[in-house]
């Protein structure tokens, strides 16, 4: 069994992984995701050191997001390296949950009130935005789209991986064409 790695240790590209087998398409982006993973630590240190070390509700929420995000990126790399989209896609969707919640919090009329509500155990879905609408996932996406126009289609595409759906059935099949161009379906596990 391999020893535990440190949080800043570079994650080598595994033999047989998509980045190893298709380096032109995946190696650079995979390395970038790994760099983003360990940048979480430095970024967290910087924002937690602001305000002369005093901590506020916003700091606690952001620290929680950073720990969750680090774990999601770390897990994504493992799933990607082992060709496991059934795990990788929901992790990406969970990362989008982080994004839409932080995006709303920082643009809310009172970010401190949102953070304080969350720190004591409240949920975003029980809060209302400036228009008096509950902060459902759809509403959070609405607010995030202003700054992240790409978020809605990615959120939608990855949502199919969270709950059992036709996406999983399609992932269990291998689609290809025969020599005459007819579509064929093979089971993944034969």
Spell out what each predicted region is:
Residues 161-190:
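Charge-enriched, short contiguous segments at helix-coil
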Residues 6, 31, 154, 160-162, ...:
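Intrinsically disordered, low-complexity N-terminal regions enriched in serine/proline/glycine
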Residues 2, 6-65:
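N-terminal, Lys/Arg-enriched amphipathic/low-complexity engagement segments
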Residues 65-71:
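Helix-boundary capping/turn motifs
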């Amino acid at each position: 069994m391999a020893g535990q790695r440190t949080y800043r240790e570079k994650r080598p590209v595994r033999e047989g992984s998509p980045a190893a087998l298709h380096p032109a398409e995946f190696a650079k982006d995979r390395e970038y995701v790994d760099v983003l993973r360990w940048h979480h630590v430095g970024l967290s240190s910087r924002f937690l050191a602001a305000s002369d070390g005093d901590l506020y509700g916003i700091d606690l929420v952001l620290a929680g997001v950073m720990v969750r995000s680090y774990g999601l990126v770390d897990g994504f790399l493992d799933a990607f390296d082992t060709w496991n989209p059934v795990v990788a896609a929901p992790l990406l969707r969970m990362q989008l949950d982080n994004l839409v919640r932080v995006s709303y919090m920082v643009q809310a009329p009172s970010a401190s009130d949102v953070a304080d509500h969350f720190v004591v155990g409240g949920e975003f879905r029980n809060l209302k935005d400036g228009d008096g609408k509950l902060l459902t996932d759809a509403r959070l996406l609405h607010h995030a789209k202003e700054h992240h126009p790409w978020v809605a289609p990615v959120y939608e595409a990855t949502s199919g991986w969270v709950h059992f759906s036709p996406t999983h059935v399609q992932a269990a099949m291998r689609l290809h064409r025969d020599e005459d161009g007819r579509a064929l379906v093979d089971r993944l596990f034969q």
